[in-house]
Amino acid sequence: MLVYQDLLSGDELLSDSFTYKELENGVLWEVEGKWVTQGPVDVDIGANPSAEGGEDESVDDTAVKVVDIVDTFRLQEQPPFDKKSFVSYIKKYIKNLTAVLEPEKADEFKKGVEGATKFLLSKLKDLQFFVGESMKDDASVAFAYYKDGATNSTFLYFSHGLKEIKC
């Protein structure tokens, strides 16, 4: 199994159990999240407590719907960015990320990040923002949005900000 860690924070953000599609010349990875239900399992043992004189047990059996990627990697939702704060974040992120990338990868990232940033800016009002479990300020952000008519959220990652780890 392959796990993808954030190069800047070390947080696990993705794994190869989620297939991705490359966007913006490979600078962004697009991954579809799925809603899953968590909660107690409904077990019917065939007994009828009211017919047997027993009382109905009051159990908190509320099921919760979560997005699999958010739950699996314990992603933390962040407040939304306005355009000014988003551009400021991207500039800081480019600086921090290119400092740790190999020169060839840094050049590749710099060439493609402008198109990726424009793509993200075009969806800014629809995006949700997530960071890894450590919630570090300079960490990579996973961006999520719903495509037209979709019930599952689509996540976007900067591919150059992920480090592949074999488990």
Swiss-Prot record:
Family listed: Belongs to the TCTP family.
PROSITE patterns referenced in this protein's UniProt entry, alphabetically: TCTP_1, TCTP_2, TCTP_3
Protein's organism: Zea mays (Maize)
Chief site of localization: cytoplasm
Compartment(s): Cytoplasm
GO CC entries: cytoplasm
Organism domain of life: Eukaryota
Keywords, in A-Z order: Calcium, Cytoplasm
Pfam families found in the cross-reference section: TCTP
Protein name, per record: Translationally-controlled tumor protein homolog
Purpose: Involved in calcium binding and microtubule stabilization.
UniProt entry tagged with the keyword Ribosomal protein: no
UniProt-listed PANTHER family: TRANSLATIONALLY CONTROLLED TUMOR PROTEIN-RELATED, TRANSLATIONALLY-CONTROLLED TUMOR PROTEIN
Keyword Cytoplasm: yes
Residue ranges of every copy of the TCTP domain listed in the record: 1-167
Any GO molecular function: calcium ion binding
